[in-house]
Amino acid sequence: MSEYWYPILGGILLGLSTVMLLLLNGRIAGISGIVGRLLQGGNPAQNIPFVVGLVLGPLLFTVIFDRFPSVTVAATWPTIIVAGLLVGLGTRMGAGCTSGHGIVGIARHSPRSIVATAIFLISGMATATFMGVYQ
């Protein structure tokens, strides 16, 4: 399989899982909301299977394609921790995450989600440029 098919397949699977979650569970696939409900003691039967799927998906990929994607992170642990906290803060400020706004919200033609996703992308590009990713 060509390396270009992996992101296409990933997008198809994201779309299918989003539609299935909505049709079978009546909920949208906003990861921050799902994890937030779990942390607040929400119904585990509705939320745990989705989170488990997020963990098992990459493992299943590795087994099926006999390939472990190589990922190199050049950042230090303090940078990673601060980045994670900033993402969490932005998720709360934006009332959702990239999956909720970018996948589900845009598909629903939500103006709030379109604006939030544009801000995510612009912020990501600015941060990557500032951090010297594009040299």
Swiss-Prot record:
Induction: Repressed by BigR.
Transmembrane segments: 4-24, 45-65, 71-91, 114-134
Parts forming coiled coils: none
Subcellular location: Cell inner membrane
Database matches in Pfam families: Sulf_transp
Membrane topology according to the record: Multi-pass membrane protein
Keywords: Cell inner membrane, Cell membrane, Membrane, Transmembrane, Transmembrane helix, Transport
InterPro entries: Sulf_transp_TsuA/YedE
Superkingdom of origin: Bacteria
GO cellular component labels: plasma membrane
Note: Probably part of an operon that comprises bigR, blh, PD_1893 and PD_1894.
Similarity field: Belongs to the TsuA/YedE (TC 9.B.102) family.
Protein name per the record: Probable transporter PD_1892
The organism of origin for this protein: Xylella fastidiosa (strain Temecula1 / ATCC 700964)
